[in-house]
Swiss-Prot record:
Role noted for this protein: May play a role in protection against oxidative stress.
Alphabetical UniProt keywords: Glycoprotein, Membrane, Signal, Transmembrane, Transmembrane helix
Protein name: Transmembrane protein 161A
Localization (cell): Membrane
Region of interest (Disordered), residue spans: 51-70, 413-432
Stored InterPro entries: Transmembrane_161A/B
Lineage: Eukaryota, Metazoa, Chordata, Craniata, Vertebrata
Pfam family, any one: Tmemb_161AB
Residue stretches spanning the membrane: 99-119, 135-155, 167-187, 225-245, 265-285, 305-325, 367-387, 460-480
Membrane topology (Extracellular): 24-98, 156-166, 246-264, 326-366, 481-489
Cytoplasmic topological segments: 120-134, 188-224, 286-304, 388-459
Topological category with respect to the lipid bilayer: Multi-pass membrane protein
Superkingdom to which the source organism belongs: Eukaryota
Signal peptide: 1-23
Gene: tmem161
Amino acid sequence: MAIMGVQMVVTLLVASIMQRVSPHYSFGRWLLCNGSLFRFKHPTEEELRTLAGKQKPKAKRERRTNGVTDEKPLTVPKDIDLRLDTQPITTIDALVLRYFLEYQWFIDFALYSTIIYLFTEAYYCVVDAQNEINIGVLWCLMSIIFSIKVLFTVMKHYFRSEEGGERSVCLTFAFFFLLIAMIVMVVRDEYLEFGLEPGLASVCHNLENFLAQRGWQWSMPFVKLAFKIALVALCAFLGGCLTFPGLRLAQTHLDALKMAADRPMLQLLLHMSFLPPVIVVVLWIRPITRDFLLNAPMGKESVELMSNSAYNTFRLWIIVVLCLLRFCLTRFHLQAYLCLADRWVEQMKREAGRISMLEIQRKISRIFCYLTVVALQYLAPIVLTFHCVLMLKSLGDYSWGLYPEPTGFTPVVDSSPVQSHSPTSEEEEDTEDVQAAVEQIMGAMSSLRGLFTPLFFRGLFSFLTWWVSVCQIVTSLFGLYFHQYLGAS
């Protein structure tokens, strides 16, 4: 409390509200159950028999009397005139969905972490709290970790599949992204302006001084190599986790465009929501964006359209707006997925042969049961990108451009020992113990701030934001090609 101050009070208050309010009102549950999404109900056996012109089967006792003992699955022709009934999704319906509780908790946590981050931004604007720990950053970091965890949980579901095709797809894309990450690591900052090398050099310099003051020695080239290997491994892991979200996004994008065939404005918004990863990737290609805006050719002269700091602010706002745009179109993508049931029935009608009633019911019900999986695949990359940008702004000492902010600074590692005074009484001894503990905690945090500089965080979170967009571009473009050409054939 003495260390965190007002931010700790607000954090505890928000955590308490989240625990008490979520069972009664949940933003994640509202996204699915606000009445805007409707599901297709599977037909009953009576309805299928009526459409097929069949009578109700005899009871078991009558079949035994007539000498019929084998029970064959009830089948109907595929070309029956089957029309599915629709029903708005309710909370009772959502409780049977797979991973519904994980989805609800994840969306609610992302919302509350964003609220706390906005509060800390306002708090830092009003109060000079540079020496306090930014609680909003910790919440954003947890949102990033939970986003990756959710994506990994969904990927594990594909690995448990009996067929094994999904597992091969994830491993193939993970290896492919591993190669791309290794290539990106050797690209110079003149082309991809992450700033990883300067940031890593500053960390190694501070770490070398920190260890030298304590009589330790460590090979700094080994630290750089280990960090790059770990980052490449993380890139491959993220690529594998984002494989099926990208493929699913391509499918729902195409289906949503077909649903909005008579709504050109909605089609324009859908196309705009599909392009954000491309725009994010281009924003970090220096010759195309920063160099052009800082030295725009105007005839024989070059004009500076914006400064370096203005471009950094502009880039942050562009990514935030693109994330919000994609989030606002969540309903259309989820409804496009739910309409797969009706589309599957229409495709079945064009086929010849017979199909069991149970298979029809199972296929239609399965599409609805995996709604929350599709929602997680759509929303988790948005949450991941959004909170990476928030971390980039706060830890990278950038500005939103809305209010004057203090310039960032790089703390110097202070290894001076804590001065101790001789106690004169038991009360003074207890007081000094508490003060010593607080000073040790503050010293440890100051050391960490001194090691990991804003320059390092700029490089790290710029790269992570850019890499998530690269994974989405590759997988979604492959998904478009697959669903338009390979899947259709």
